[in-house]
């Protein structure tokens, strides 16, 4: 089995070395970047499986780099940052981060979250879960299981971040069934739901913007107040 490769994007050398040591102790190959230029260079030359990134970086900050990353690749992304206000967390998740941890962090919690994301990112895992399918069709749209993309009725393709793809795959596999936030978060990230965790709601809001004519009054992914969500699309 190929050793997973983790890219740490962090400008503080002490923190970067700490993260490198933590992940290497878990058996991962670790690459380091202190800014966006180095990040893109490493991504272009190595098959990275997970990115762990700070927000406060020299030059382009982590939020801008995450947006660029999402336009190019569908990699698991964890923000690890000293910025702990709710606005930054929601914005990070809106852009497409799969997880968000604040400093100071618990090394054990970080490695567990990283391991869960890597497990769900393995190509064979996606193939096992799709039972030989290449796509799902619903309401004129298509979820491509190979490219992890949503394709419009006109043929335009939108690459989905890992968490959005996992949520959509779960919805398409379970049409019409109530999905609790606990179930969705477990499918998306592998972690348990905690109080005030809005990861699922933010991810659903991003997904709805793709295909709901009126995202605030959706008719494909319905909100079941106090319980969760239900996918009401017409699966073909």
From Swiss-Prot:
4-aspartylphosphate, modified sites: 54
GO BP annotations listed: regulation of DNA-templated transcription
Keyword check for Ligase: no
DNA-binding recorded as keyword: yes
Top-level taxon of origin: Bacteria
Subcellular location: Cytoplasm
Gene Ontology MF annotations: phosphorelay response regulator activity; transcription cis-regulatory region binding
The entry's DNA-binding region: 133-233
PANTHER family: AEROBIC RESPIRATION CONTROL PROTEIN ARCA, REGULATOR OF RPOS
Protein name listed in UniProt: Aerobic respiration control protein ArcA homolog
Source species of the chain: Haemophilus influenzae (strain ATCC 51907 / DSM 11121 / KW20 / Rd)
